[in-house]
């Protein structure tokens, strides 16, 4: 398997002067590639040949290793293969001499200033990275160590301990060894202090009460991705829809221009109409007429959370759509598909309002045929708002049959990758839109929140220092995540959500950049133990219960771009590729486009990307390799990071790239079925997915035209003047979860 650990006793000096541990698997891959190029069948001696190459090495230079490969091929009598390997080396050297190397900060700086940097009031310009880190750090100090100003007099030992923990941990954020919740980077400060929902990337809750719908709007407006369930057992708890009183007077409701005001309009005016006397829900209700006069015009600046006001039209459209759905169901309960469409209308309001791109996942009962075919057989075209949520059937391990699983997979292959699937141990388990967090045992009428931090594996050094560095990063990530778990003030939500967060706090310490540094796979169990121990210690210090689930692997789309590493457990797309990022109205985007007009094409900014020579790319792994990595991460990171007594566990959220033909896809499906206990939610994508797009989000550089475009983007690049930006439009122009990989994409046949 290409993910085996490097051999630390031999250090290899790369062409850029850096050193990495010798990894025999890379030798095996190069030998097999030479056999393929020569059109010869692969042989059993390949491992023996790799051993001889390892024994041949003395200086540890890359060129010497390649010489040893040539000699080994010749010694074993494979002269044709050796010739192909020599040609391959020559072409690689020639191509390398012609390549331009992009500025390593080009994309990461753009991501930071576009999504996380806020307006620094003192200077009147956007924050630097250090200022953003300080903003989030100081928020935690205000919450947990308010007496820290008196520490010099020795009056507050508890505050001193907490302050030291916070200061030390955020130095690791400053050096980008770890990341806190990416929502805290965007909203840290007043925006989170008045609404703790903004701390968390995602949440999950069953739709078992009408209030869950208005709360979902509130959560999406707060920046949370929303996972929800319309399983029979949950939707069956909803009351029958009341009938409109024929001659009742019209009730007027003026909508406040806050996220609470928007969500209250949905709750009071549509979902749970009440009598004028406030006596509670009735069997019939009055018509509510909305007044939108207090809502700021589109384009106004939002001061607390940042961003631009969307105006009232999207809200009005949503309220009318949801009202129509309720009217069509008078005298009966809503069906799961109707609840799902209501939720999609709510999310569409958030998107159409220009506030942010919503992220949602809908879990449904596997026996619900309307939900199974929600995006199939033309149903998607008739209900375009269903694009707002990914749909996944809940498959209970031990109950679902292989034939039904195959049916779901077959339907997904014909319907743009949906429905997806989520394997659970009981129907009460749920997940967030990206699928890395497991929820179970939620209190009635409550939401569970994803509390995420991240370890940058690419920043872990090679060699003997790697283990201690990785464990230290795990400790810092656990400290920060435990501090985040104490933010449990959720205005507008049912009090039970706060009670749930206090009684059963969750933590999700994730890993990213594994493809940059597979050496960390040796230390996962030790790292998980550090996460558990640190969480228990810090939780006791701040008065929280220890988390039962502490480790996960999230997709890490945006966070990995900020760090300049591979995303989560995924390999890089290719050695060199062009990334297209959609143009938005944020000032950072406009600054980049102004400095680099030739990099803007068809509504996207084009970024040239080049990955380290020794990093793993998609072509290095087949589908089974990727699944085996997921299994290893579950076995050595997820399970060891789960305490006894937990009724669920977190997950490795991954998109598996699959090569079409030769039964490869079917072998991948077989592997998933045969290892159910290791898998919860996966997405599949064809290896050649970029061929499905005229302008793919990620485009491999493989033709002369692409080579010319890549080099042009590198040579003409000019650093934008981000610090001169004097407005705060940034944080509202982001996805409602931190992924890019949440979407289940087309499954190859």
List each language-model region with its residue ranges:
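Extended catalytic cores of very large enzyme megasubunits
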Residues: 1-749
């Amino acid at each position: 398997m290409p993910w085996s650990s490097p051999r630390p006793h031999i250090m290899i000096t790369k062409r850029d002067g850096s050193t990495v541990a010798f990894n025999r698997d890379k030798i095996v891959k190069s030998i097999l590639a030479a056999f393929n190029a020569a059109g010869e069948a692969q042989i059993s001696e390949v491992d023996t040949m790799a051993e001889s190459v390892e024994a041949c090495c003395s200086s540890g230079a890359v060129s010497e290793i390649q010489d040893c490969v040539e000699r080994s091929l010749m010694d074993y009598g494979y002269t044709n293969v050796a010739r192909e390997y020599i040609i391959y080396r020559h072409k690689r050297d020639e191509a390398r001499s012609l390549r331009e190397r992009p500025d390593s900060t080009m994309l990461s700086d753009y991501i930071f200033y576009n999504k996380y940097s806020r307006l620094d009031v003192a200077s009147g310009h956007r924050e630097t990275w250090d200022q953003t880190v300080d903003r989030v750090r100081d928020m935690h100090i205000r919450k947990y160590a308010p007496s820290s100003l008196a520490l010099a007099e020795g009056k507050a030992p508890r505050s001193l301990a907490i302050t030291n923990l916070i200061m030390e941990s955020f130095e690791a954020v400053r050096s980008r060894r770890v990341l806190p919740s990416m929502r805290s980077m965007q909203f840290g400060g007043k925006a989170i202090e008045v609404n703790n929902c903004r701390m968390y990337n995602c949440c999950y809750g069953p739709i078992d009460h009408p209030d869950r719908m208005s709360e979902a709007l509130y959560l999406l407006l707060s920046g949370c991705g929303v996972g929800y369930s319309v399983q029979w057992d949950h939707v069956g708890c909803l009351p029958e829809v009341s009938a409109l009183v024929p001659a009742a007077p019209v009730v007027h409701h003026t909508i406040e221009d806050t996220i609470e005001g928007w969500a209250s309009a949905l709750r009071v005016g549509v979902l749970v109409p009440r009598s004028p006397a406030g006596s509670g829900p009735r069997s019939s209700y009055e018509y509510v007429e909305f007044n939108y006069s207090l809502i700021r015009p589109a384009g106004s600046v939002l001061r607390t959370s940042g961003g631009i006001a969307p105006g009232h039209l999207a809200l009005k459209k949503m309220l009318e759509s949801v009202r129509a759905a309720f009217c069509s169901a008078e005298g009966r309960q809503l069906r799961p598909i109707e609840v799902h469409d209501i939720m999609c209308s709510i999310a569409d309001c958030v998107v159409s309002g220009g506030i942010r791109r919503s992220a949602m996942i809908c879990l449904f009962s596997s026996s619900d045929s309307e939900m199974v075919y929600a995006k199939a057989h033309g149903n998607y075209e008739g209900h375009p708002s269903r694009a707002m949520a990914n749909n996944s059937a809940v498959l209970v391990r031990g109950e679902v049959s292989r034939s039904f699983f195959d049916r779901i997979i077959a339907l997904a292959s014909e319907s743009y990758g949906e429905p997806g699937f989520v394997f659970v141990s009981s129907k009460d388990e749920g997940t967030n839109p990206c699928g890395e967090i497991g929820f179970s045992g939620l209190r009635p009428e409550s939401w569970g929140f994803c509390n995420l931090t991240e370890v940058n594996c690419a920043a872990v050094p090679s060699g003997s220092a790697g283990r201690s560095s990785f464990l230290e990063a795990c400790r810092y990530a656990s400290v920060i995540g435990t501090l985040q778990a104490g933010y449990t003030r959720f205005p507008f939500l049912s009090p039970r959500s706060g009670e749930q967060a206090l009684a059963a706090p969750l933590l999700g310490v994730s890993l990213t950049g594994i493809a940059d540094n597979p050496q960390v796979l040796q230390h996962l169990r030790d790292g998980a133990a550090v996460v558990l121990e640190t969480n228990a210690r810090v939780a006791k210090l701040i008065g929280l219960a220890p988390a039962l689930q502490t480790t996960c692997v999230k997709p890490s789309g945006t966070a990995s771009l900020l760090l300049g590493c591979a995303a989560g457990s995924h390999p890089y797309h290719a050695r060199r590729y062009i990334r297209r990022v959609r143009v938005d109205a944020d000032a950072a985007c406009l600054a980049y486009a102004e400095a680099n007009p030739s990099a803007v094409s068809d509504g996207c900014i084009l970024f040239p990307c080049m990955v380290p020579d020794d990093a793993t790319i998609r072509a290095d792994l087949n589908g089974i390799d990727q699944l085996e990595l997921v299994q290893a991460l579950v076995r050595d990171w997820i399970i060891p990071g789960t305490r006894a007594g937990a009724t669920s566990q977190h997950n490795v959220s991954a998109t598996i790239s699959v090569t079409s033909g030769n039964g490869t896809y079917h072998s991948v499906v077989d592997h998933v079925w045969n290892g159910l206990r290791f898998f919860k939610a996966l997405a599949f994508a064809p290896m050649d997915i970029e061929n499905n797009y005229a302008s793919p989000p990620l485009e491999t550089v493989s033709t002369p035209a692409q080579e010319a475009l890549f080099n042009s983007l590198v040579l003409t690049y000019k650093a934008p003047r981000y610090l001169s930006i004097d407005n705060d439009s940034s944080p509202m122009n982001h996805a409602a979860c931190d992924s890019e990989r949440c979407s289940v994409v087309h499954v190859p046949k």
